[in-house]
């Protein structure tokens, strides 16, 4: 059952190693390599999005890989929230965050 007011963030959405057709929804410049559920959860927590982790779920485009997913508060467009989460993970990893253009 779908939770009202929640967005689903799959690791594939922000994974730099995935193509757009494989599920990535943000640019390669803003995405990160192989994001983990715990990193997504921590970044969403820092952004005040009240994350809920569901580790047993599999992304429909790659149903054979159990990657898990994170439910976050719906505070705007999914692509914007995914980008914010990816940039927060980059900061946590100590990577350079691209300048706004």
From Swiss-Prot:
One Gene Ontology CC term in the entry: signal recognition particle
For the keyword Metal-binding, the answer is no
What residue intervals traverse the membrane? Answer: none
What terms describe the molecular function in GO for this protein? 7S RNA binding
Sorted keywords for this record are: Cytoplasm, Ribonucleoprotein, RNA-binding, Signal recognition particle
Keyword Transferase applies? no
- Which Pfam families does the record associate with it? SRP19
- Gene Ontology BP term (one): SRP-dependent cotranslational protein targeting to membrane, signal sequence recognition
Cellular compartments annotated: Cytoplasm
For this protein, the record's Gene3D superfamilies field holds:
Signal recognition particle, SRP19-like subunit
Alphabetical list of SUPFAM superfamilies matching this protein:
SRP19 (SSF69695)
Name the InterPro entries on file.
Signal_recog_particle_SRP19, SRP19-like_sf, SRP19_arc-type
Q: Name the HAMAP family on file.
A: SRP19
Similarity section = Belongs to the SRP19 family.
What quaternary arrangement does the UniProt entry report?
A: Part of the signal recognition particle protein translocation system, which is composed of SRP and FtsY. Archaeal SRP consists of a 7S RNA molecule of 300 nucleotides and two protein subunits: SRP54 and SRP19.
Q: Which PANTHER family match?
A: SIGNAL RECOGNITION PARTICLE 19 KD PROTEIN, SIGNAL RECOGNITION PARTICLE 19 KDA PROTEIN
Q: What does this protein do?
A: Involved in targeting and insertion of nascent membrane proteins into the cytoplasmic membrane. Binds directly to 7S RNA and mediates binding of the 54 kDa subunit of the SRP.
The record's listing under NCBIfam families reads: PRK00754.1
| This protein's name | Signal recognition particle 19 kDa protein
Q: What is the protein's species of origin?
A: Methanosarcina mazei (strain ATCC BAA-159 / DSM 3647 / Goe1 / Go1 / JCM 11833 / OCM 88) (Methanosarcina frisia)
Lineage, top ranks: Archaea, Methanobacteriati, Methanobacteriota, Stenosarchaea group, Methanomicrobia
């Amino acid at each position: 059952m779908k939770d009202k007011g929640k967005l689903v963030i799959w690791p594939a959405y922000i994974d730099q190693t995935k193509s757009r057709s494989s599920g990535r929804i943000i640019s390669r410049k803003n995405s990160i390599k192989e994001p983990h559920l715990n990193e997504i959860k921590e970044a969403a927590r820092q952004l005040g999005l009240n994350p809920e982790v569901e580790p047993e779920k599999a992304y429909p485009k790659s149903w054979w890989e159990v990657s898990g997913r994170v439910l976050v508060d719906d505070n705007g467009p999914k692509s914007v929230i995914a980008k914010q989460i990816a940039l927060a993970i980059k900061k946590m990893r100590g990577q350079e965050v691209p300048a706004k253009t």
